Curated annotation (Swiss-Prot):
GO terms for molecular function: electron transporter, transferring electrons within cytochrome b6/f complex of photosystem II activity. The 4 large subunits of the cytochrome b6-f complex are cytochrome b6, subunit IV (17 kDa polypeptide, PetD), cytochrome f and the Rieske protein, while the 4 small subunits are PetG, PetL, PetM and PetN. The complex functions as a dimer. It is a single-pass membrane protein. It holds the Pfam family PetL. GO terms for biological process: photosynthesis. This is Cytochrome b6-f complex subunit 6. Its main location: plastid.
């Protein structure tokens, strides 16, 4: 059970990092 929660948190962190990187690059292109 704990392993599943840890996996979900890891996935959420990875998704947030990817989204932040994507938006960051988009912002750089707009400038």
């Amino acid at each position: 059970m704990s392993l599943i929660i840890g996996y979900i948190i890891l996935l959420a962190c990875a998704f947030g990092l990817a989204a932040g990187l994507y938006f960051g690059l988009s912002a750089i292109k707009l400038i």
